[in-house]
């Protein structure tokens, strides 16, 4: 994998998170769900070219500004783990989420969820969540993890690396 694609992932993700926080009206203690196909980010087909390096580049870019703003990250696993989510234990406890007994791996859970697990201080997997906003990288289908009502958010970024990306915020019904 070229350094060029990793640099693009970092640059695209940096712009995306900087724009999404204010555009989605995210505040400390709220949850951002991120679904990510590392395969799509590097130009492959979802589920076929898992890239731990691309996943690491993404999480290492997203996590610092989210933590600085007090926004809680929920990383969606792939379908092999029934789209469970990786969160910090404190997030699960605060929102009353019951942990499930799984640990993601690059080919069972996904490279992104694995990278998040490795970087969190006290990670747990939960079955479902109702996030305040979302970032879907590579058409991973995060809608099931958003609160009602989801509203599209348009940012200047339409791709993270080679993957299409869409963003959402939520509002009360």
Where are these regions (language model features)?
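Short glycine-enriched, charge-decorated loop/helix-capping segments at active-site entrances
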Residues: 46-52
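Ligand-binding beta-strand-loop-alpha-helix segment within the catalytic cores
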Residues: 69-132, 138
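Generic secondary-structure signature for well-ordered alpha-helical cores
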Residues: 18, 22-25, 63-71, 117-125, ...
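Structural motif
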Residues: 32-35, 166
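N-terminal glycine-/serine-/threonine-rich phosphate-binding loop
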Residues: 1-32, 52-65
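Glycine-rich beta-strand-to-loop/alpha-helix junction loops that act as flexible
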Residues: 34-39, 76
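Glycine-rich, aromatic-bearing surface loops/beta-hairpins
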Residues: 114, 118-173
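Solvent-exposed alpha-helices and their adjacent loops that cap or buttress functional pockets
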Residues: 24-26, 108, 154-159
């Amino acid at each position: 994998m070229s350094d060029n694609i990793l640099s693009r992932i970092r640059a695209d993700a940096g712009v995306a998170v900087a724009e999404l926080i204010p555009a989605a009206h995210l505040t400390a203690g709220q949850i951002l769900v991120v679904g990510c196909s590392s395969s799509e980010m590097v130009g492959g087909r979802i589920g076929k070219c898992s890239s731990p390096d691309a996943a690491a580049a993404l999480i290492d870019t997203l996590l610092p500004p989210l933590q600085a703003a007090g926004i809680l990250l929920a990383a969606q696993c792939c379908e092999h783990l029934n789209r469970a989510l990786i969160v910090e234990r404190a997030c699960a406890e605060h929102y009353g989420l019951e942990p499930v007994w799984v640990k993601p791996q690059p080919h069972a859970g996904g490279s992104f969820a694995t990278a998040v697990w490795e970087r969190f201080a006290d990670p747990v997997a939960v079955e479902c969540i109702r996030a305040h906003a979302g970032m879907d990288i590579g058409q991973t289908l995060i809608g099931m993890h958003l609160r009602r009502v989801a509203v599209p958010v348009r940012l200047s970024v339409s791709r993270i690396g080679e993957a299409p990306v869409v963003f959402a915020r939520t509002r009360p019904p």
